[in-house]
């Protein structure tokens, strides 16, 4: 009887130990998967912005930081920081293209000296197994080209949001030109992640002190970004 009791205790302890190991492994695996990031940095003096960095995590969290003037004639403002959730479709494309680009291991720049400078770019990948990056001006690699386009389009969208927020506070008549340009760029598929600037678009769309044509444009952009204003 006592032997059976000891055996049962040992079996129970073994089972508990195995469950503990499984739990630790599951937590480690989940942490490893969620820690993967792809980032893009651009430094291009005299452009607007002259520097920005965008990092996307495999869990959908994204961070954007930029410096530079709002317009060519304005004074340099404080650095701009924004955190948002990237759409699943864009996140999937980013990590898929990173894999196709072999996670930026090795050289990706064309190495050609007769290509005009479009800014110093850095693509980087980080997870539990890799920590790689590649610097380039122009790359002939199709996956790198796709990533460059995606990140630049996201930056353009977020910089629109930055200017819209400023104009909404200090120069409301300037909103119309910005919103009109945004609509045109959406049609030409030159913007990504419109939902990231939905808060300022909602503020404009519901602000009675903004002219109607600008409010209507903001409403259309919200609908295109998948966050239409609810009708009352």
Where are the language model's segments positioned?
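Bacterial N-terminal signal peptides
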Residues: 12-23
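Acidic/histidine-rich, surface-exposed loop or edge segments in extracytoplasmic proteins
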Residues: 63-82, 180-183, 199-200
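N-terminal secretory signal peptides
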Residues: 43, 48-75
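N-terminal post-signal-peptidase region of extra-cytosolic proteins
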Residues: 40, 49, 77-81, 103-109
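Charged, amphipathic alpha-helical segments
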Residues: 88-111
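Short, well-ordered, aromatic-rich surface patches in folded extracellular/luminal domains
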Residues: 6, 25-46, 107-232
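A short, structured loop/turn motif at beta-sheet edges
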Residues: 58, 85-93, 125-131
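Bacterial N-terminal signal peptides that target proteins for export
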Residues: 2-14
């Amino acid at each position: 009887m006592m032997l059976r009791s000891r055996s049962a205790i040992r079996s129970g302890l073994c089972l508990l130990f195995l469950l503990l190991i499984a739990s630790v492994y599951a937590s480690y695996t989940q942490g490893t998967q969620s820690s993967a990031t792809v980032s893009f940095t651009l430094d291009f003096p005299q452009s607007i912005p002259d520097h920005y960095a965008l990092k996307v995590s495999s869990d959908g969290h994204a961070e954007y930081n930029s410096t530079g003037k709002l317009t060519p004639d304005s004074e340099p403002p404080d650095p701009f920081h924004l955190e948002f959730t990237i759409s699943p479709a864009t996140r999937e494309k980013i990590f898929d293209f990173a894999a196709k680009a072999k996670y930026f291991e090795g050289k990706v720049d064309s190495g050609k000296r007769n290509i005009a400078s479009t800014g110093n770019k850095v693509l980087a990948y980080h997870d539990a197994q890799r920590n790689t990056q590649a610097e380039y001006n122009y790359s002939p690699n199709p996956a790198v080209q796709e990533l460059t386009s995606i990140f630049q389009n996201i930056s353009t969208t977020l910089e629109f949001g930055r200017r819209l927020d400023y104009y909404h506070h200090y120069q409301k008549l300037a909103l119309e030109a910005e919103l009109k340009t945004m609509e045109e760029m959406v049609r030409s598929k030159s913007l990504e992640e419109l939902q990231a600037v939905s808060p300022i678009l909602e503020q404009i769309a519901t602000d009675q002190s903004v002219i109607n044509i600008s409010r209507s444009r903001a409403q259309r952009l919200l609908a295109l970004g998948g966050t239409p204003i609810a009708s009352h």
